[in-house]
């Protein structure tokens, strides 16, 4: 079976309908029965439009980079990608083939 991993690069402050984008993406993926999703919080990062930002022990309201990742079959990923693109706007989305060796229902 062919599997795909999608990574969506966003920031902590990004919103979807006034709610945190990363949580809304995970909720949408869960409702669409995607095998699994994860949000990774960076300790530092930059983009073409913003300088390097990094975390410190005193930062409470920082705007650090986040990566939302999910993995499932090509068919299931293709089904949710239009909504992911709508929610992510112009943010970077990467799709890559993966070989799932172990874990949940993806391995037969």
Where are these regions (language model features)?
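Positively charged, small/polar-rich N-terminal and surface patches that mediate targeting and assembly
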Residues: 1-108
């Amino acid at each position: 079976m062919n599997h795909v991993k999608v990574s969506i690069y966003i920031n902590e402050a990004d919103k979807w309908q006034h709610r945190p984008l990363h949580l809304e993406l995970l909720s949408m993926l869960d409702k669409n029965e995607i095998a699994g999703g994860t949000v990774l919080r960076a300790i530092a990062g930059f983009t073409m439009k913003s300088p390097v930002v990094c975390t410190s022990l005193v930062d409470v309201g920082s705007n650090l980079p986040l990566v939302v990742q999910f993995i499932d079959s090509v068919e299931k990923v293709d089904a949710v990608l239009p909504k992911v693109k709508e929610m992510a706007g112009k943010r970077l989305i990467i799709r890559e083939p993966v070989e799932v060796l172990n874990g949940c229902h993806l391995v037969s």
